[in-house]
Amino acid sequence: MKRPTIQDLANASGVSVATVDRVLNGRHRVREETARRVYNAAASIGYHAVGLLRQRVFQDLPHHRLGFLLQRPTQSFYQTLAREIEQAANANTSSRVTAQIEYTTASTPAAIIEKLKLLASRNQAIALVGPDYPAVTAEVEELKAKGIAAFSILSDLASGVRQGYVGLNNRKVGRTAAWMIAKAAKRSGKVACFVGSHRYLGHELREIGFRSYFRENAPDFVVLETLINLETPEITHEATINLLKQHPDLVGFYVSGGGMEGAISAVREEGLAGKLAVVVNELTPDSRAALADDVVTMAIATPVKSLCNELITLMTTSIGSEGDAVPGQSFLPFDIYTSENI
């Protein structure tokens, strides 16, 4: 594919080549509205100097440094989340945003706190995914005292201390998973729920919603003891195989967090595609294939692009402002996928 030329950019912007040249080289002042139109067109057509254009267009805006602490860098979902954070940072038009993304492969308080301190040394606001530990709350409180706002994403933590939460209403997510299983199961019977850890408030709320739906609306189903999978495919695979052996009359299960790849492989291994009602979290290449093969009944997904745009806006707004400048919770509508809309 031919690389877009300056003429292509002028055509896409609806301005002359001379105007594009002025924006690129900053020789003469161009109206802000026109400069932004040229930049947006450059981004949309993949113009090679889009980085330079951004620098020219937004050079007078404040510079904000934002830190992000994510989990498990090898997982498809977190890779997608990182890409969307970068894109949202680059697309922000109220300030120039530099995003620093770090990962932690261990969910221990010490590992999380170490990364938070690293991010705090370089950034003005921080967002993190993690379990809710008292030690982490204490660290978030220390950051707050230093004027560094912390936001929880996907799973809430440090309630009353963190600046805000951006993610799904996890209780509703759990109830929706239960609703699907109750409707899709071949008959009433035993159902199970996997959580990554009881320290993940988001998983706990999903479990609460899952159980409450069955208790209120489908009492003829039996919800088994909750299974811990540490969000790893290996543990989830083994736990699913054991679950199916111990309860051959199982009619469905829900993986509320990570590790669904192991559950999917276990259902395939046991030849149970189409025989169980299975709900997983997030749409990834693995869950998409499982939906197509009738291994998974439904995937409940986070609108990652919307989450990142909202998060960047709230984080930049929080810098240098009072605590009530941003909402305490920002719930996003979740996406639902079945075999018919992937």
Predicted regions and their residues:
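N-terminal helix-turn-helix DNA-binding module of bacterial transcription factors
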Residues: 1-54
